[in-house]
Structures are given as structure tokens and as C-alpha cells.
From Swiss-Prot:
Pfam families: Yae1_N (PF09811). The complex LTO1:YAE1 may function as a target specific adapter that probably recruits apo-RPLI1 to the cytosolic iron-sulfur protein assembly (CIA) complex machinery. May be required for biogenesis of the large ribosomal subunit and initiation of translation. May form a complex with LTO1. This is Protein YAE1. The keyword Cytoplasm applies. Keywords: Cytoplasm, Nucleus. The lineage of its organism: Eukaryota, Fungi, Dikarya, Ascomycota, Saccharomycotina. Residues 38-78 are annotated as: deca-GX3 motif.
């Protein structure tokens, strides 16, 4: 790309006289200010559009993930409320699940790729607690 192609480059004439040929320093300053603001507004607008597009693409996955975590915690909490007093393993697992499935721990950069896809580590974590849920459900509610 040559300097002539760069619309942000100003020629010496534009610097001296402004785009519209005005020689006033105040007018030149005003033109420069508006040109810079227009450039920044364009950059900001492009960033917002890309951010919104990324949000729109990944929101369903994040929503599903949040629902999945909430469902595991809720069901383990119910089992703990009903049977935790007599089952120390269940109570211990429930407390550990609460700690490991905190949203601030689940939604860390380490659990997602550059494309914001869930990593194997996150999938393994969820599979572990879903497995525990199946174990305790079949132990206490065998017909489910």
C-alpha cells in the first residue's frame, strides 16, 4: 500500500491549508479533530460489531454450560439435603462440587480455547460431577 492510498496521510497542502483550502489554524485544528474522531468512531464501531457477533455465536454455548452446572449443583444439593446427614461421602462430594463448579472457576480462560470453545479439562470436570450425580441418584433413587 502506497502513501497515496492511505487516507489518514495528509498532504503538505492539507496540513497548510486544510482539506477545504481554509488557511485558518483554528479551522485546520477543527478538521484534524473531526478526522481523528471519525477514525476512532469507525474503529470503535467495528470492534463493537465484532464483539456482538462473538457474543451472539457463543451465548448459546455459555447458556447451556451455565444450565448444566446449575443442574448438577441443584441435584447434588437435593441429594445432600435428603441423605447427606447419613452419607459423609455424599456430603463431602457436594461440598467439593460447590467449590469446583463456582462460576468464577468454570468461566476462566484456562477452560476455553482461543476460539472460546470449552477445553477437554472443562468437559472432564463436568463429566466427573455428572458421574457422581448418577452414582448418588442410583444409590438413593434407584428407579430414576
Amino acid at each position: 500500500m502506497s502513501c497515496e492510498d492511505d487516507w489518514l496521510n495528509t498532504s503538505d497542502d492539507e496540513e497548510k491549508h486544510g482539506v477545504f483550502g481554509g488557511g485558518s489554524l483554528e479551522l485546520q485544528k477543527l478538521e484534524r479533530t473531526h478526522r481523528n474522531r471519525g477514525y476512532r468512531d469507525g474503529i470503535s464501531s467495528a470492534k463493537e460489531e465484532n464483539l456482538q457477533e462473538g457474543f451472539d455465536m457463543k451465548f448459546p454455548e455459555g447458556s447451556r454450560l451455565g444450565f448444566q452446572v446449575g443442574e448438577v449443583i441443584g441435584k447434588l444439593q437435593t441429594l445432600d439435603s435428603l441423605f447427606g446427614a447419613q452419607d459423609s461421602e455424599l456430603r463431602s462430594d457436594y461440598k467439593e462440587a460447590l467449590a469446583q463448579l463456582q462460576i468464577s472457576r468454570v468461566l476462566t480462560h484456562a477452560n476455553f480455547s482461543e476460539q472460546m470453545d470449552a477445553t477437554e479439562a472443562l468437559s472432564s470436570l463436568l463429566a466427573r460431577w455428572e458421574g457422581a450425580l448418577v452414582k448418588y441418584t442410583s444409590r438413593y433413587i434407584p428407579n430414576v
